[in-house]
Swiss-Prot record:
Biased composition (Basic residues): 49-59
Name of protein: Large ribosomal subunit protein bL32
SUPFAM superfamilies: Zn-binding ribosomal proteins (SSF57829)
Pfam families from the UniProt entry: Ribosomal_L32p
A GO MF label: structural constituent of ribosome
Gene Ontology BP terms: translation
Polar residues bias: start-end ranges: 23-34
Keyword Iron: no
Spans annotated as Disordered: 1-59
Family: Belongs to the bacterial ribosomal protein bL32 family.
Cellular component, GO, one term: large ribosomal subunit
Length: 59
């Protein structure tokens, strides 16, 4: 098993963890219905960029 030679400083630990944060999902509002959905995904009622592309949950 590998054992570290010297202890890492809090600064180096923070530098390593600097890319570990999570980003919030980007949201869009549908033009016709005003419903909020994830970007580049269809909304729950089946609309994408103002067009009906599939049957939604309510249909």
């Amino acid at each position: 098993m590998a054992v570290q030679q010297n202890r890492k400083t809090p600064s180096k630990r923070g530098m390593r963890r600097s890319h570990d944060s999570l980003s919030k999902p980007t949201l869009s509002t549908e033009q016709n219905t005003g419903e909020t959905h994830r970007r580049h995904h269809i909304s729950a009622d089946g609309y994408y960029r103002g067009r009906k592309v599939t049957r939604g949950q309510d249909d």
